[in-house]
């Protein structure tokens, strides 16, 4: 689960990390009161969307007069931002965050992620903040330092010193960054966050360190333990199909293609998307119905796929625990219930796949069956292209 920048800063502030004073604004009626609360000569207007790259897309405006701030807010609210992390359609700005301007002496980068390879939380630090860390890692890898934290011992002072060792930082700077890293680690543990990123972490001329921008993601499987964080969920920022899919236990990710996919298993779903691209088309979604899909689940999956106005659908099922004849009956029932007016290619393999294929072939419905994945992908791509 993602949250907005202003929400992430509220959490970080609760754990002792300094953040600029700010006020969230939902409408133009709130602007005057919000500006008065900030009481700063420089006001930064920030679009609040669940995507990075806002600055380059005009989603972060530094205002030095009240009129500039009001104009920026007016232009930003209700607008659509397209960044490298949004879809081609962009995301609508429904709220903006007004924040006091800060005296920036130096920008740093610091984050914490769940490192699944090592089974630990990793703290990442760089003296090159304010830019994409991927660019820094690619161009100057020596400027990015990663420290893995053993969960048995937790964060220790030497972890912070290791982060800063080659950065030519003073003892005081190292002490302050170590303190921030420890607080980030504690926040990760106590909130079940999967990622915390502060970029940039700024140092002011007076030597203070402030989180100028913040991003937090949370583990969906642990969010039930944090109802106060679940309340921060902004459904307006999420894709409607993904919300609907989650209600039925389906894993769905919307993409920009035109061929809908229904698959059981994440690995098989990725392979299915790859082979669709191999034959010259683009998948419209990632949809994993899981290992225990029922007729109702299959029906809901079709409804979700069709709501995206796809030009064709590829169903790729490997029957292990789930029998192919049950899936076939589910597909038939779903088509009879909701109707499908786009080409449908089905590939079944595994337990009872012969029976499943026979059921589909004898259904007298407009279903094209395939013997293997390559044939299935080739068929659906070529049918859609005609």
UniProtKB/Swiss-Prot annotation:
Its EC number is 6.2.1.5. It is an enzyme of class 6 (ligase). Mg(2+) binds at residues 199, 213. Binds 1 Mg(2+) ion per subunit. Its cofactor is Mg(2+). Succinyl-CoA synthetase functions in the citric acid cycle (TCA), coupling the hydrolysis of succinyl-CoA to the synthesis of either ATP or GTP and thus represents the only step of substrate-level phosphorylation in the TCA. The beta subunit provides nucleotide specificity of the enzyme and binds the substrate succinate, while the binding sites for coenzyme A and phosphate are found in the alpha subunit. This is Succinate--CoA ligase [ADP-forming] subunit beta. The gene is sucC.
């Amino acid at each position: 689960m993602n949250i907005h920048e202003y929400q992430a800063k509220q959490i970080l502030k609760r754990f002792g990390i300094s953040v600029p004073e700010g006020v969230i604004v939902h409408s133009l009626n709130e602007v005057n009161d919000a500006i008065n609360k900030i009481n700063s000569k420089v006001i930064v207007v920030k679009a609040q969307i669940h995507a990075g790259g806002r600055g380059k897309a005009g989603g972060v405006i530094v205002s030095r007069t009240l009129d500039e701030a009001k104009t920026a807010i007016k232009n930003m609210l209700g607008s659509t931002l397209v960044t490298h992390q949004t879809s081609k359609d962009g995301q609508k700005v429904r709220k903006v965050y007004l924040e006091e301007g800060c005296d920036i002496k130096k920008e740093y980068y610091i984050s914490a992620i769940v490192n699944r390879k090592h089974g630990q939380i990793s703290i990442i630090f760089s003296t090159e903040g304010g830019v994409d860390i991927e660019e820094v890692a690619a161009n100057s890898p020596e400027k990015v330092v990663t420290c893995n934290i053993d969960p048995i011992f937790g964060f220790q002072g030497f972890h912070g010193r290791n982060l800063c060792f080659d950065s030519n930082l003073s003892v005081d700077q190292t002490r302050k960054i170590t303190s921030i890293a420890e607080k980030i680690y504690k926040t990760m543990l106590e909130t079940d966050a999967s990622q915390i990123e502060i970029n940039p972490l700024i140092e002011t001329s007076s030597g203070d360190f402030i989180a100028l921008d913040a991003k937090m993601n949370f583990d969906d499987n642990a969010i039930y333990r944090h109802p106060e964080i679940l309340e921060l969920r902004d459904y307006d920022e999420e894709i409607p199909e993904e919300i609907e899919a989650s209600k039925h236990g389906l894993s769905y990710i919307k993409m920009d293609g035109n061929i809908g996919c229904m698959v059981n298993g994440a690995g098989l779903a990725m392979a299915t998307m790859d082979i669709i691209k191999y034959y010259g088309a683009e998948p419209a979604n990632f949809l994993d119905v899981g290992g225990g899909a029922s007729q109702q689940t299959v029906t809901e999956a079709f409804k979700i796929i069709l709501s995206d106005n796809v030009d064709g659908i590829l169903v790729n099922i490997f029957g292990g625990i789930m029998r192919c004849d049950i899936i076939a009956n589910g597909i038939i029932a779903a088509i009879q219930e909701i109707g499908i007016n786009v080409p449908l290619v089905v590939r079944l393999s595994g337990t009872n796949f012969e029976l499943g294929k026979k059921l589909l072939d004898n259904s007298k419905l407009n279903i094209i069956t395939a013997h293997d994945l390559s044939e299935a992908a080739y068929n659906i791509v070529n049918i859609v292209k005609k």
